[in-house]
Amino acid sequence: MSESPETPEPSPAQSPEAAPEQPQAARPVTPGSQASFGTYGGRPVSFVRRGTRLQGRRQQAWEEHSDRWAVDVPRHIANTSVHPDYVFDAEAEFGRSAPLIVEIGSGLGDAVCHAAEENPDWDFLAVEVYTPGLANTVIKINSRKLSNVRVVEANAPEVLATMLPAGSVSEVWVFFPDPWHKSRHHKRRLIQPEFAALVAAALKPGGLFRVATDWSNYAVHVRDVMAGSADFVNLHDGERRGPESPLTQVWQSGVESLVGGAPVKEGRAPVSTEHTGPNEGVDETGGWAPRFEGRIRTSFENKAHEAGRLIFDLCYRRL
C-alpha cells in the first residue's frame, strides 16, 4: 500500500523494562480528564472518550516518561483541542530531518511502535484521544528503546488542520476507525470529504493515505469519499473487483449480520447485508489494496478475523 511518485513503503510489537537514557528538559504534560462527546467547532466529533484515568503501570509510565515522549500542545477549548497558533516542528522534536508518518487513532500503540522499530530512519507521530492507550504506547516506546515515536492527545482534524505544517507528512494512517454503524451516526465517521481535504493538505505531493477497516459498509463509504476527492488517486483503482473482491465475498457470505444497522452476536438474527448498499451481489468497482505489510496484525485485527470478517485495505497517493 511500483507506482511513481510514491514515498517508500515501510515494511512491517510489551512490558516496561528499562527506559532509554536520553536526558531532556521535562515538559508539562497533563492528560485530559473530561469526557468528550457531541460537537466541536460546530461539527460532530468522531470519538467518545471512554476512560481517561490512569492506574498502575500506566500511571507510573505517564508520570515518568510523558515529558519525553508526549507532545504537549496548548489547548483551545476542549481538552483534546489544539490551539490554532501551535505548529509542530518535527525536525526540532526528533532532532533530524526524516519522513514523518502520522497514525490517527493509534490505540495501544502496537502498529506505530512496530513500524517505528522496523523503520528507524522514519519518524512517527501517534495521535489518540484515549489516554490509557497513549500511556501504553509510552510503555512500548521505553521498553523497546525507541527514539523515533511521539504521542499526542488531540482531536485528529485539528492536528491535520493547524498543528502539522502543510505538505510536511509522508504518510497518514487510519487503521480500523470507529465504523459508527447506525445511519444516524454516520455523520460522526472520521473519514468524510472535509477530512480527506485535511489529509491532502498535510501530505507532501506523492504522500500516501492508508486506510484499513473490517466493516464493508465503512470500506464502501471510504471508497466513495475518496473517489470524490480531486487531491488523491487510488493506487489500486479497479483492482480486486468481481469475484476476487472482498466486498463481493462479504455480500455473498452474509458474514456481517446486522439488525437495525448495528452488529449483533452470532445466532441472534438472520443474515442481512443490506447495509452495504444497493449493489449487493458482485462488486464491479474494486479498488481494494493488498494488505499493507507494514501494519502488524494486532489483537483487534485478530478478533475481526476470528469473527469471520474480512479486512479492507485502501491506499491513496496525494497528487
From Swiss-Prot:
Database matches in InterPro entries: SAM-dependent_MTases_sf, tRNA_(Gua-N-7)_MeTrfase_Trmb, tRNA_methyltr_TrmB_bact
Active site (catalytic residues): D178
Transmembrane regions: none
Cited Pfam families: Methyltransf_4 (PF02390)
SUPFAM superfamilies documented for this protein: S-adenosyl-L-methionine-dependent methyltransferases
UniProt-recorded Gene Ontology molecular function terms: tRNA (guanine(46)-N7)-methyltransferase activity
Extent of Low complexity compositional bias: 14-26
Catalytically driven reaction(s): guanosine(46) in tRNA + S-adenosyl-L-methionine = N(7)-methylguanosine(46) in tRNA + S-adenosyl-L-homocysteine
The enzyme's E.C. designation: 2.1.1.33
GO cellular component terms given for this protein: tRNA methyltransferase complex
UniProt keyword terms in alphabetical order: Methyltransferase, S-adenosyl-L-methionine, Transferase, tRNA processing
Residues involved in S-adenosyl-L-methionine binding: E103, E128, N155, D178
Region of interest (Disordered), residue spans: 1-44, 262-288
UniProt keyword annotation of Kinase present: no
Binding site for substrate: K182, D214, T298, S299, F300, E301
Similarity comment: Belongs to the class I-like SAM-binding methyltransferase superfamily. TrmB family.
Protein's job: Catalyzes the formation of N(7)-methylguanine at position 46 (m7G46) in tRNA.
Protein name: tRNA (guanine-N(7)-)-methyltransferase
